[in-house]
Amino acid sequence: MEIYIRLNADVEHDYAFQVSNEDTINNKIKKIFPSKTGLADLMVLRPSIFHEKEPVKFYKSIHPGYLSEGGCLMFHYEADNEENLEELNDSKPLIDQLWPGQLVVPEWKLSKKNIWVYTIIMLAWLYTDLPDAISPTPGICLTNQLSRLLIPVAKHMDLPEIAAKLEQEVQANYSSLVAQWLFFVMHIFKVGIITLFLKLGIANPISFNPYKLWSLRDLTSPSANGAKNSGGNNNTTDLKTRLRSLGWIGAKRATYDDYQTNYYNYVIDKMGGAVAAYRAGAIRKAAAPGIQLVAGEGFQSPLEDRFTASTFTAIKTERKFILSEEYFVELENNLKKILEEYDGDIGKMNAEIRRFRRFGIYEPDEKLASLVKLRREIADEKEKASNNDATFGIKKNDLKKSN
């Protein structure tokens, strides 16, 4: 079974992982995050440097999600909101807790150690740039330290004017009081920008240790791995073997916006251009594909009914889209039919599988297409009824005012 795990607490980093019937949080998912045996030293997993490297808890998203035009499920942007999360049992098999394709959301704890270290470094840096007029140790800023290193170099290269200029600049109170305060304010602003980038995870390095980053090159190099393993080094594990043992697939689930853009371009190309698509009446659906599911549908379907419920019956009798084993078998059959059309072309088949994992199916068979059509009709009926109720309420209020 394939599931998705949200890394970096980022909606754009929902990665697919393969799990077996016996896999649990303890014996599978938690192994993804340690430094030496997992992926923490190979790629950034945590939201920012201010978080611990390993999550403290794991949740599943029970937001119903979106039903795509191909009959697949996409994650909603509110999938990781607190009200849409349910904690997973660490020792219970994942297959008994999750639907195929469901989203697992790790909970990350702030690292007090990292926060304190960063704060001390930034405060020390700010201290060195205090205006000379108020600093207990004027003239110790990093710029002055660099200038002091360049003075003997300038003298050695017989550049007395430059050396003299540098010697003047390193003197305390060389700049005017206004300039000193202006530079200090700019320095505070610079520290604020750096902190913002790190907090938001825009800058989120694996490590600040250059040696550690350099040593990772050996692990990510297939030739280096082969050489070290053949030499009997048990501390170095082949990267592909490690990824395979963790269930890593390497595919990311698309956000709804990515899906919408990709599906729109697909429809336009298929129709032979925007004009042809407009004439065929396909533009409206391509511009806003899919249907947002409601409570009790999608990933909120009762998991205990997985092997007894019928998705295609419930859409007609209960007027809602529920998940079932029948539905996932139909998805698998659809994908197999699509792959058969490539006549054994491995490249095209792999590309289609990657697209399926990222965007779902684009050309469903009649059974899946009918399912989506019925669910869209239900959504349209609800929207029409809601609009009628709103119109009736407005007219009722107008009648009261006239009386």
Swiss-Prot record:
What GO cellular component term, any one, is given?
Answer: endoplasmic reticulum membrane
The question of whether Ribonucleoprotein is a record keyword is answered with no
Tell me where it resides: Endoplasmic reticulum membrane
Molecular-function GO terms, alphabetical? unfolded protein binding
Q: Which Pfam families match?
A: Gsf2
User: Where is the chain membrane-spanning?
Assistant: 178-198
The residues forming a coiled coil are: 330-388
* Spans within the Cytoplasmic topological domain: 199-403
Membrane protein topology class: Single-pass type II membrane protein
Per UniProt, the keywords (alphabetical) are:
Coiled coil, Endoplasmic reticulum, Glycoprotein, Membrane, Signal-anchor, Transmembrane, Transmembrane helix
InterPro entries on file: Gsf2 (IPR022757)
Q: Which domain of life is it from?
A: Eukaryota
| Entry's Gene Ontology BP terms | protein folding; protein localization to cell surface
Where are glycans found on this sequence?
Answer: 89, 173
Lumenal-side segments: 1-177
- Summary of the function given for this chain in its UniProt record: May be involved in the secretion of hexose transporters from the endoplasmic reticulum. Involved in secretion of GAL2 and HXT1.
> Anything else of interest in the record?
Present with 21400 molecules/cell in log phase SD medium.
Q: What is this protein called?
A: Glucose-signaling factor 2
What is the originating organism of this protein?
A: Saccharomyces cerevisiae (strain ATCC 204508 / S288c) (Baker's yeast)
